[in-house]
């Protein structure tokens, strides 16, 4: 099966092409913060020759606690993302949570993302599809890999073929996630080899059953990223923070920003080795 390819300007997403980094922060904390972090990502990725799409959320609509920080909201958040895009000359991605957010988000962002918890919401899918934007579909934690074909089919029936699919772990008992390495191949097969992204940081989430926010295992991010890259991915989804312990959301899963360059050096090395190997089919 030939790998599907999705173009985003000069960036090409395909499972047999050099990987693209969808990297950034979990949630927008301020304009200055977003510009600073995006600038660091651009510097590192330019040095290493890694295509970059900068990620940030304007609203974390699915926080566990009503008291948790959600973000600046749609209007201010999109204004910040536009400034980041214009200042650094890099494409941007954000997630949307309601049909009304799809069009304004697509007017600013190069990719819009369907959150994992909302991946079966048909009205939202239809609104996102109609924008014509490239869509990153997060696989829900509760959905089997093969069931992603139904989500993909909804988008196609709504007229959008510009699709990326994203693995972010699966429920393993209560309050825990695991990444099934066999799932990558299943998702590629059932979705006709659409470009596959691996969200390594959200896959590290592990909840305290009595806690009001998600915990995480960022000490294992290198292990998980190396493992994921070995299956041949179109892209890696990564969130970083200069001080993860002070992050407004998902700090326990975030890579310390100071480690971005050595981390990506290792990831790129594995990607290059894997994609230089001949295809070996086992029936």
From Swiss-Prot:
Annotated compartments: Cytoplasm
Keyword Ligase on entry: no
Major place of residence: cytoplasm
Gene Ontology MF terms: 3-deoxy-8-phosphooctulonate synthase activity
Catalytic activity of the protein: D-arabinose 5-phosphate + phosphoenolpyruvate + H2O = 3-deoxy-alpha-D-manno-2-octulosonate-8-phosphate + phosphate
Highest taxon, organism lineage: Bacteria
Gene Ontology cellular-component annotations: cytoplasm
Gene3D superfamilies in the record: Aldolase class I
Pfam families linked: DAHP_synth_1
Record-listed E.C. numbers: 2.5.1.55
GO process terms (BP): keto-3-deoxy-D-manno-octulosonic acid biosynthetic process
UniProt keyword terms in alphabetical order: Cytoplasm, Lipopolysaccharide biosynthesis, Transferase
Pathway linked to the protein: Carbohydrate biosynthesis; 3-deoxy-D-manno-octulosonate biosynthesis; 3-deoxy-D-manno-octulosonate from D-ribulose 5-phosphate: step 2/3; Bacterial outer membrane biogenesis; lipopolysaccharide biosynthesis
Sequence similarity: Belongs to the KdsA family.
PANTHER family listed in its UniProt record: PHOSPHO-2-DEHYDRO-3-DEOXYHEPTONATE ALDOLASE
Protein known as: 2-dehydro-3-deoxyphosphooctonate aldolase
Organism: Prochlorococcus marinus (strain MIT 9313)
Phylogenetic classification of the source organism: Bacteria, Bacillati, Cyanobacteriota, Cyanophyceae, Synechococcales
Gene encoding the protein: kdsA
